[in-house]
Amino acid sequence: MRTNIIIIVSLFALLTGGCEDKPVPVPFEPTPYEIDIPFGFPTNLNIPDDNPMTVEGIQLGRYLFYDGRLSGRTEPDSLMSCATCHRQERSFEAGVDHPDFPGGFPHGLTGLQTHHVMLPMINLVWNSTGYGWSGFLYPDNPVEELRNIEDFVRLTVLAKDEIDGDTATVKNLFQTIDGYPQLFEKAFGSSTVTFRNIERAIAQFVRTLISSNSKFDKYMRGEVQLSQSELNGYVLFTTEEGADCFHCHGGFGNPLFTTHLFYNNGKDTEFTDPMDRFSISGDPMDHGAYKATTLRNIEVQGPYMHDGRFATLEEVIDFYSHELQVSPYINPLMHHINNGGIQLIPTEREDLLNFIKTLRDDEFLTNENFSSPDSFPDEK
């Protein structure tokens, strides 16, 4: 009997001792991040159900967006990140003054130039019709890997004319960099780095890149007044008999200043680009059609159009004024095509330009939350 009691007591001590030594799992509870929808902006946001916004995910995404080791390499001449081409001061576009890409025409680590110039990364959380000049990434794409910003990250890393990397190499590299595994654990509940979570983190950060505090925004909120020239330009912008910009770029009631749709806007008469909207839709009327980009911060971007043919906004306005090209595929909304353009006189062109410049948001262009971190996780 005494022996049995000793055995039971010993077994109890062993079991309770084991319980004390067993680590208690830390619950995975990332901090939800709710986008503060600006005045007058749409309430529908394009955020995938499998990638909810969190403070930790956005923080990690910001590091990854700017870290040149996203190339999967560590040699100084082989570093490339999202920010290499998407510069904050140029509304996350390359810009004509890019130090490494003369004229704003980017090329990848292989030296191969990108097929089209960069699009700005701005207010993309409201884009639900398709990403890229042709809209080849869209939510209901039958190809699951071609649907959203997350997929864009992967394609950018793999593209020969961009990072020219390998997803396995990239995720393995970040697994070895001090500080990153801990950030992945905080953001996604596991210190094991996966490329899928790299995609998710960067996409979360990109969805925070919201511009909503330009002079025009302040005017709409009743905080400032526009000059007479700017008001004249606004009237031109929003009227069919004026500059007729609003059909493609939105007018009153569309603070995004884009419809996110695709148009043949009369640039050419021959269409040989294998990456226009027709390549996606198969609709013959989409020959030579490309996304109407947002005009927010357009002043600091450029070059303009899908192929960067115009270096300045003045050139763009001149084109729409009297250089439109007739073709069988011209979009029906180009109502002034038979006149060769909208035929603006010099003062009207100046007024239109002055209005477009009111869409510049310097707060967005300098927001420290969007800027490169002072240091990366392994440098702290």
Regions found by a protein language model. Give the residues of each.
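Sec-dependent signal peptide recognition
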Residues: 2-9
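C-terminal capping alpha-helices of c-type cytochrome domains
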Residues: 171-182, 186, 190-212, 299, ...
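Short glycine/threonine-rich turn/loop motifs
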Residues: 23-146, 214-319, 324-331, 367-380
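A short, charged helix-loop
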Residues: 143-187
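Flexible glycine/proline-enriched surface loops and loop-helix/loop-strand junctions
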Residues: 42-46, 154-155, 163-168, 186, ...
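C-terminal motif of bacterial Sec signal peptides marking the signal peptidase cleavage site
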Residues: 15-18
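Stable alpha-helical elements in mature extracytoplasmic
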Residues: 57, 81, 145, 149, ...
